[in-house]
Each structure stands twice: as structure tokens, then as C-alpha cells.
């Protein structure tokens, strides 16, 4: 087998040295080419020890690596083994991959790795000042600290250059200390400078408590990691995957990342179950405290849940496919595809009766490209669907009321979920498609205590502040402040479209009639006559709020035949793709 390597303009000596070193390392023939050359400038075959491409080579002098280089290779091989074998075995028993096997699953080799020798002096027998006969800096296998428990570097993922940070759980349970923190800070700083996405493969028990003096509160300590997360937010995509229980400091990276994927069996919490019991007396398991179900359905901290490590990788790949390398780049467009189901059926999917439920995902499937939808946080705030999808290959963020859940009324969790999704799409230049079919924000003492006004405000603020192209479609009902939250006419969408059954009103007919005509109706003794009068008032109200009236008053831009909705949206997103908007000059708003 022959391995070919391309290098930008190497000298003859550099090419020869590289060929020889790689041939020795990989145990196969290596040919080195210039970046655009057709013929190799150097070759090396480890079996025969021959080197070509360098004039007048002394075969004996250049027979292979020196003893010094061999010693270095031995040290590297030792580092690559990770922590003690017993901890690698525990990883296997837990159904988890060793971190370097995990990287093999994700990438065809790292482009490069930084900091393999981090904390080398503290454990390796070859370290300066260490007795060669000892097993480590402190004399035991359990003291192995290869790479200080954190791997950092760069790789190509699905054709994209990315930064990678991955905890090695075989090293002190993936805990973080001074050198690992330094590596992570450097990676984040470089990502901020060069504008490439960051993948965090997190499997960490948090900070090393016995070493906190060196990294906890320092200006360049672990606190700076979250500062850097904040600076990277909205600048380059940050995707985090959780593989095991992540406690305290380790649990902040997932929530700071733009997107978090939890593998079944993982967990994250501000404190361990033991600490929780000590502080509160509550006895609880790690899964009950912060497992995937908790964060996917109750806290909203997890965007996606994967059954296993391979699915986690596939979900991350799908996520990245919608995202640009940085806020300065355009989201990647692909070749378009027809929808999974024909747009001709849109009108039959949406019931004529305003209060009848249906699954809005059936509507989405007739609008967007087939197999292009990735719903985020599906179990959290399920009254609103937030999803990435493609329209003729263009990535879009879909925000859709879900009449199949609580009639599509907007509850606090759903409002917060939608606000965060809109904010993220806007940060990375992803256009927004709103599909509005809601009776408005939910009312009642329960939702008031849960912050419906505060969280509803965030959703409205996000719609108002988003400067990416927006299209609002009034699918059926748009009542109350729901039309504001769904980026209606007052919120500067490029277009407000409506299907023929749409209604825009302060409230629904029943509520309006009760508010305005309650006494008049109560004065009618005959039940049949009262019912007829209610129906008359209802129809009169409906005519007043019917979408045709709104189109006549130019409140909306167009009533669209349902079967043409997809084509209409494709054309409008194409036309407005280069739209630029500026917010008023200010440091930032006060709403978060």
C-alpha cells in the first residue's frame, strides 16, 4: 500500500525527511508531492529503507530514524494509550468508546493535535528529572496524565475544517486542570481568530478539586473558558456532544454551546447526586437529576438526544450542514429536492374548522425539501415546532405553531424555545419561515407564575430584532399577540402571506362575542333564538377578521393558493436573499 502526501513547496531535504518519517510511522510506502505536482519529489519504503528524490543520498547515514526520534515515537505511542487500562475497560463496560477511538469514528484522522505532551513532566518516566525505572512522575499507573486528559486539535468533518476538543475519561475521569484548561483556551482563541466551527466532545467529571489553585479563579483559568464561549457565541458555531455524567464546570460547556446533543446514558447537573443529598437531603440518581429526559423535555437544555455514539455523530453532521463556518459566511446551500409530500395536499392538511387540531409537521413536509427537516427540542415547549429545513436547497429556520399540542397556544417554555432558535438563526444568517396558526399566548395563573409575559416578551423581541429575511404565513388563525410573536406585519417580514382560511384578530370569535355581547345574549330567554344570534354575531365577526378583508386593507401582502405555497416561498426567499437590515444604533437591547 502506498500513501500519498501533498505539501506546499517543500525543499528536497524537507520532502525526503517527511517521506522517511511517515514511512517509518505508518509502516508503508510514502510518496511526497508538491501541492500541484504530478510527480513525487520524494519517496520512502520502510521495508527496504530506500529514499528517493534527494541527490547523492548517503544510504547508511539516512537509513532511518535516530535513537532520539525513536524515543520520541515511543513517548507519543505511550501518550496515545490514554489512562490506565482498567479505566479503558470501564469505558467499554459502560458502552462508551475510548476517546481516540471516538475520534476515529468522527474523523479520518486529525489534521493535527496540539498539546499531546501537556503535563508530561508530572507522570512520564522519560520526563526530565524523573527516574527511568519508575512508572510515572508519582510512581504509579493511576497517576498517568497523558495530554492532561483533554485532546485538542483540528480535523475535517463532513468536508468542513473544524476545531475539536475531547475529554479522555480514562484520565482522572476526564477532569480538567491547569494544562488542559490552557489547551482549551488556546483552541477557543484560535477559533475566534480564524472563524471555524468548534466541536466539544464532552466526557468530564468537572475540575480537579485537588489542583484548583492552578486553574479555578485565575484570569486564564477555567472561568475564562465560559468567557470565551460567550465571545464565540454567534461568531462561530459551537456544537457539544455529551457522553457521560458531566458535573459542575463540565456542565456549563453544553449549555453555552449553540447546540447540545446528549447520548443516552449521559447527564449534566450543577452538582452530583452525592452533593445534592448532602445539601438538600434529596436522594436522587444521576439520570433523574440531569439525564437526557430531564434536559430534553423539562429544562430545554438539550437540543437532541442520540441512542448511541454513532447517532450522535450523525446528528452533529446534520446540524453542521445547515450552518456556516462563521457569522461572516453564508449558510451552505445544497441541490434542491421536491418535498416528501405534494404541495397539492396542503389545503386538505389544514382543517377548515379553526379549533380542529392537526400536526403542523404534515404541512411542513409539503413545503420543504424531502428529508431536510431536523427538529430541535421536539419534547420541550411542543406547542411550537422549531426546525432546520431546506427550501430548494436553501437552509431555513422554521418556527411553526403546533395545533396538535394544546391547540397551538403559546406557553412559556415554547416562547423561550422559539426565541432562542430565532436568535441563533439570525446570528448565523439563516432565513426564517414562520407558520402561524395560534390562538395566542396562554392565559391563567399557572402560566403567569411560569413567566408567560417575560418569556413571551423574549419571543417578540427576537422576532423584532432578527435582521435575516423573514417570511410569515398565516396558515389559519393568528389571534392576539400571537401574530406579533410569529413575526406578523408589524415585525418587518419581507412578506406576510396567508392561506385562504386565515384570520387575524385580537381574539377568537367566541371570546370576542362573550366580551362584547354577553349581556345582550343573556337577555334572550329562548335558547334557540340565543344560539341563532350567537351564530350571526360569530359570522359577522369572522367576516371582519377574514384574510380577504386583511388583504383588501393591505395588512397582508398576498393570499396564496395553498398548492403554490412552496413555490411562492422559494421565489421570495431567493429574491430577498441579499436583503440587509440595520438595527438602531445602540450597544445592545436590555432584553435577554
PLM features per residue range, with description:
Residues 5-7, 22, 30-32:
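Hydrophobic beta-strand residues in large extracellular and virion-surface proteins
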Residues 4-12, 37:
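A short, exposed loop/beta-hairpin motif centered on an aromatic-Gly-Thr core
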Residues 45-592:
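Ligand-binding clefts of soluble mixed alpha/beta catalytic domains
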Residues 27-37:
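A short amphipathic beta-strand at an alpha->beta junction
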Amino acid at each position: 500500500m502506498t500513501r500519498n502526501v501533498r505539501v506546499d513547496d517543500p525543499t528536497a531535504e524537507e520532502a525526503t525527511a517527511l517521506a522517511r518519517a511517515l514511512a517509518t510511522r505508518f509502516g508503508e510506502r510514502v510518496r511526497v508531492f508538491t501541492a500541484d505536482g504530478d510527480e513525487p519529489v520524494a519517496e520512502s519504503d520502510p521495508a527496504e529503507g530506500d529514499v528517493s528524490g534527494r541527490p547523492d543520498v548517503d544510504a547508511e547515514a539516512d537509513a532511518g530514524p535516530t535513537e532520539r526520534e525513536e524515543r520520541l515515537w515511543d513517548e507519543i505511542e505511550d501518550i496515545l494509550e490514554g489512562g490506565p487500562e482498567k479505566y479503558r475497560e470501564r469505558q467499554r463496560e459502560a458502552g462508551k468508546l475510548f476517546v481516540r477511538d471516538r475520534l476515529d469514528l468522527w474523523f479520518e484522522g486529525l489534521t493535527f493535535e496540539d498539546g499531546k505532551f501537556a503535563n508530561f513532566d508530572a507522570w512520564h518516566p522519560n520526563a526530565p528529572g524523573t527516574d527511568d525505572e519508575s512508572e510515572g512522575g508519582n510512581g504509579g499507573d493511576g497517576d498517568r496524565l497523558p495530554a492532561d486528559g483533554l485532546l485538542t486539535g483540528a480535523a475535517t468533518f463532513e468536508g468542513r475544517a473544524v476545531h475539536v476538543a475531547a475529554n479522555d475519561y480514562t484520565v482522572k475521569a476526564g477532569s480538567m486542570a491547569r494544562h488542559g484548561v490552557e489547551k482549551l483556551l488556546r483552541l477557543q482563541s484560535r477559533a475566534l481568530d480564524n472563524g471555524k466551527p468548534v466541536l466539544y466532545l464532552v466526557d468530564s467529571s468537572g475540575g480537579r478539586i485537588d489542583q484548583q489553585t492552578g486553574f479555578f479563579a485565575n484570569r486564564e483559568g477555567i472561568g475564562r473558558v465560559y468567557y470565551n464561549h460567550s465571545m464565540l457565541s454567534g461568531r462561530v458555531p459551537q456544537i457539544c456532544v455529551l457522553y457521560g455524567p458531566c458535573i459542575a464546570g463540565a456542565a456549563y460547556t453544553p449549555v453555552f454551546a449553540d447546540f447540545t446533543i446528549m447520548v443516552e446514558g449521559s447527564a449534566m447537573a450543577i452538582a452530583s447526586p452525592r452533593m445534592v443529598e448532602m445539601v438538600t437531603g434529596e436522594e436522587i440518581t444521576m439520570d433523574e437529576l440531569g439525564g437526557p429526559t430531564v434536559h430534553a423535555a423539562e429544562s430545554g437544555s438539550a437540543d437532541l438526544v442520540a441512542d448511541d455514539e454513532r447517532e450522535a455523530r450523525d446528528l452533529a453532521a446534520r446540524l453542521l450542514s445547515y450552518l456556516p463556518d462563521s457569522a461572516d459566511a453564508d449558510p451552505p446551500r445544497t441541490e434542491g429536492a421536491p418535498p416528501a409530500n405534494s404541495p397539492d395536499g396542503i389545503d386538505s392538511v389544514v382543517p377548515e374548522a379553526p379549533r380542529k387540531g392537526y400536526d403542523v409537521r404534515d404541512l411542513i413536509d409539503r413545503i420543504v425539501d424531502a428529508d431536510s427537516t431536523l427538529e430541535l427540542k421536539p419534547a420541550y415547549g411542543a406547542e411550537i415546532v422549531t426546525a432546520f429545513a431546506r427550501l430548494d436547497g436553501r437552509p431555513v429556520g422554521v418556527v411553526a405553531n403546533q395545533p396538535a399540542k394544546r391547540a397551538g397556544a403559546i406557553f412559556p417554555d415554547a416562547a423561550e424555545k422559539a426565541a432562542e432558535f430565532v436568535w441563533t438563526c439570525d446570528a448565523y444568517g439563516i432565513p426564517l419561515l414562520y407558520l402561524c396558526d395560534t390562538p395566542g399566548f396562554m392565559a391563567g395563573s399557572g402560566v403567569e407564575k411560569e413567566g408567560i409575559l417575560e418569556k413571551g416578551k423574549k419571543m417578540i423581541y427576537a422576532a423584532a430584532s432578527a435582521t435575516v429575511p423573514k417570511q410569515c404565513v398565516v396558515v389559519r388563525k393568528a389571534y392576539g399577540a400571537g401574530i406579533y410573536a410569529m413575526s406578523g406585519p408589524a415585525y418587518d417580514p419581507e412578506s406576510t402571506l396567508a392561506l385562504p382560511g386565515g384570520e387575524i384578530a385580537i381574539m377568537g370569535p367566541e371570546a370576542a362575542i362573550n366580551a362584547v355581547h354577553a349581556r345582550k345574549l343573556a337577555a334572550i330567554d329562548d335558547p334557540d333564538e340565543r344560539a341563532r344570534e350567537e351564530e350571526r354575531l360569530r359570522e359577522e365577526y369572522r367576516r371582519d377578521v377574514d384574510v380577504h378583508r386583511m388583504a383588501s386593507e393591505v395588512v397582508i401582502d398576498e393570499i396564496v393558493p395553498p398548492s403554490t405555497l412552496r413555490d411562492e416561498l422559494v421565489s421570495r426567499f431567493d429574491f430577498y436573499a441579499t436583503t440587509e437590515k440595520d438595527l438602531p444604533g445602540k450597544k445592545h437591547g436590555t432584553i435577554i
